[in-house]
Amino acid sequence: MSLELPVLADLRMNLVPPDVVESTNAAALVADPIRASILAMLRDGPVCVCEMAAALGERQNNVSNHLARLREAGLVRTSRHGADTRRVYYERDESACAVALGALRDVLG
């Protein structure tokens, strides 16, 4: 059974635009409990990986892997603070997080 052309046109109108798909992909990363916890920790400002790992009770390399995924999605960024410039701090990219949240709202209505 094939769909009539007007029905297909109506269905296509409800497809998610590519920019929203990209934002929902970023938002989907937050479905992981560790990544959600990381983003919550970063709410108040930059935190280094070693502090996050200790707070989460996770190995540092595991937390680093989660941070890499969040960074690839643009949800977090890195910086170096203080005298010890070897230590990398992570912070949320608030505008990217807002876009991802808005995309979820658009999809879920």
List PLM regions with ranges:
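Short beta-strand "wing" residues that participate in macromolecule-binding interfaces
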Residues: 77-78
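Short, Lys/Arg-enriched N-terminal segment that forms or immediately precedes the first helix
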Residues: 7-27
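Residues within the DNA-recognition helix of helix-turn-helix
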Residues: 66
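Glycine-centered, phosphate/nucleic-acid-interacting loop/turn motifs that mediate DNA/RNA or nucleotide
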Residues: 74
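Alpha-helical DNA-recognition elements
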Residues: 69
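N-terminal helix-turn-helix DNA-binding core of bacterial DNA-binding proteins
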Residues: 21-59, 83-95
